[in-house]
Amino acid sequence: MPTISQLIRKRRVDKIVKTKAPALSYGFNNLKNKVQKYKSPQKSGVCIRVTTMTPKKPNSALRKYARVRLSNGTEVNAYIPGIGHTLQEHSVVLIRGGRVKDLPGVRYHIIRGILDAKGVINRKQSRSKYGSKKNKN
């Protein structure tokens, strides 16, 4: 426990909080031709490569992901959730933050049901997360 005179000489240092989705925390201003810091909940981008990746040790699968060039110029890896997708190169997608625990380097999710990422068909539960419409029965 420091004394008051010690705190006057050297104040307490705040902890530096590192962002978990850094590509969403800035954008590129084309008018001023420079990067500006502001936080966004989502960003749009264009798929450069759509491929699969194997997860870390105890799990085994082929997880689908896309390399996306965002509107601020950065390239990120984004996970494609749900069963089946129609994404290919040059597809325009919207991404959100949120990592995939067993895929190293994947810190973002593609939002299904918006732009070129179609919703999951025949999905009954958690439809809003996968952009699926309600079945007409």
From Swiss-Prot:
Pfam families: Ribosom_S12_S23. GO terms for molecular function: rRNA binding; structural constituent of ribosome; tRNA binding. Transmembrane segments: none annotated. The modification 3-methylthioaspartic acid is found at D102. InterPro entries: NA-bd_OB-fold, Ribosomal_uS12, Ribosomal_uS12_bac. Keywords: Methylation, Ribonucleoprotein, Ribosomal protein, RNA-binding, rRNA-binding, tRNA-binding. It comes from the Bacteria. GO terms for biological process: translation. Belongs to the universal ribosomal protein uS12 family. PANTHER family: 30S RIBOSOMAL PROTEIN S12 FAMILY MEMBER (PTHR11652). Part of the 30S ribosomal subunit. Contacts proteins S8 and S17. May interact with IF1 in the 30S initiation complex. This is Small ribosomal subunit protein uS12.
